Amino acid sequence: MSTTDTIVAQATPPGRGGVGILRVSGRAASEVAHAVLGKLPKPRYADYLPFKDVDGSTLDQGIALYFPGPNSFTGEDVLELQGHGGPVILDLLLKRILALPGLRIARPGEFSERAFLNDKLDLAQAEAIADLIDASSEQAARSAVNSLQGAFSARIHQLVEALTHLRIYVEAAIDFPDEEIDFLSDGKIEGQLNGVMADLEQVRTEARQGSLLREGMKVVIAGRPNAGKSSLLNALAGREAAIVTDIAGTTRDVLREHIHIDGMPLHIIDTAGLREANDEVERIGIERAWNEIEQADRVLFMVDGTTTDATEPAAIWPEFMARLPATLPITVVRNKADITGETLGLTKVNGHSLIRLSARTGEGIDLLRDHLKQSMGFTSNTEGGFLARRRHLQALETAARHLVQGHEQLVSAYAGELLAEELRLAQQSLSEITGEFSSDDLLGRIFSSFCIGK
């Protein structure tokens, strides 16, 4: 679809509201203003005007704002009409504008896409707009604003610039091998490369924090029936999210709760008790439980402390441990400490975390919250931090891998050509984050996830 068309969309959420905004972007924005307003508003000044239909009747009245390109959000001529937020009024106004020649409805994210294509935003900043809208906590919102203002992009540009300087030295060493100073063997390039690798690792650490803030952690509570899984879900959620009874198999389906621990989003999933199913409904619930377990970031293995003294997971339930993915982190939760009299606390058992608590009374729940936060490496002090997506983490990981391979080529064989290629590939991976090197397919996937009017 053409990016030279003039586009229009509602920039406020659908439904009733105090204010409804229509946004127009493109070369025909001034023609829309003349047709609907009767004049072109003074640039960047709010003008209170009637919004006219084709026959001259007034559809609504409100604020009109005109931003000539390139000094606008999209870099094109932009007109905003801010009227009353009734859906009927907005639909009538939208139909009025679409009746004009050369106008069409914007695709999801097309305003932000045009801002990116016109160099008003880089790709990381454009993504931050969607992240700010979707932020589920104050900390996530603040980090999204930092990304929108260029905090993440600035770190990436610093790394790219450092790699550019490093490539200059390497290319010089390759092109002028007979010079008195051999840059490849005198340690200068290795020292600079080590510095870039250290800086990249710091950015990766901050990006992992940003990814946790954005996407959160998926924790699945699993175990036998009546181990206290639903009670634990309620204790973590701080409300009666799940029905709790003494009847084994009360939970038949997956229950989900979304909470925050010091700003970190946590997706808690309560599952059906794992056992040989008594009927088809329970069998489906248990199958769904295993599907959730296999996709978890961490499993809370819930154990009824009144039924066993074992603390080693394989000794508690060998069949359960045998089916778990080998790389999946687990925390053994020995429940019902209020009955067994066990000392509350967190310990390590053969490399596994074990916590003793009472889901019914809430004793030990704060210890579990701290453990979940620490197990993901999350720190609540992220002043100046930024949000990151999975694709950002993948690009950073790829760049780090190329730098490690380049370092190996340098120290083992002084292979300048191979080092130069690894540096180029690392730089290319970093540039994918800001969109300086991105395929059209990637851009399409990113912007299609945005709101219509963004």
UniProtKB/Swiss-Prot annotation:
UniProt GO molecular function: GTP binding; GTPase activity; metal ion binding
Binding site for (6S)-5-formyl-5,6,7,8-tetrahydrofolate: R23, E80, K120, K454
Gene3D superfamilies per the UniProt record, alphabetical: P-loop containing nucleotide triphosphate hydrolases, Probable tRNA modification gtpase trme, domain 1, tRNA modification GTPase MnmE domain 2
Subcellular location: Cytoplasm
Enzyme class: hydrolase
Binding site for GTP: 226-231, 245-251, 270-273, 335-338, 358-360
Subunit structure: Homodimer. Heterotetramer of two MnmE and two MnmG subunits.
Protein's name according to its UniProt entry: tRNA modification GTPase MnmE
Source organism per UniProt: Yersinia pseudotuberculosis serotype IB (strain PB1/+)
Recorded name of the encoding gene: mnmE
